Amino acid sequence: LDGREVAVKVQYPGIAAAIAADMDNSETIAMLLGVVFPGLDPQELVEELRARINEELDYENEAANVGIFADYYRGHPAIWIPAVIPELSSTTVLTTEFVAGERFEAIYERSQEERDRVAETLYRFVFRSLNRQYTFNGDPHPGNYLLADDGRVAFIDFGLVKHFEADEVEQFARLIRAMLDRDASEFRRVAEDVAVLRPNAPFTDDEIY
């Protein structure tokens, strides 16, 4: 309305109802997961999946996630989170700043130095968000990144975001340390502590690691 260029994401009509109907089969999904992955809690996995899908279908929830990341990275020299325009957004419509730039695939045509710089930006975004904000963007793929004309990397999809407590992030750090130390027993202990693995799951430590 004021002449700004914007990007508009519109939810396909009926998609929420269709997905909800599919998720009604969650008991069957849980049973199959229990057979394939006997060391995991299948019902917990299915409930987590259901919660994340419901959140991803709610564009007001996504707008709130964008706000968290945009506030944190505002002014960052390498990372751009396009801000939401709330008066043009709703549960099924999300309107943000427009990003002038190229699709992420264009990185393959750039110099090795530029590719290294962009890779470092992605790495820093993921782990800084997790370790400082206790948030994780759960949909990291090239379609959700843009190479902005000003040199920054723009991140454009925040429908699938997980928010953690500080102690949960510390447990993830313990998992990573165990992997780096090649300590299979410690890796198993931490995996059980964070409920990724059932206690006494029918696998050896080395198989889990």
What spans do the regions from the language model cover?
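Conserved catalytic cores of large enzyme domains
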Residues: 1-209
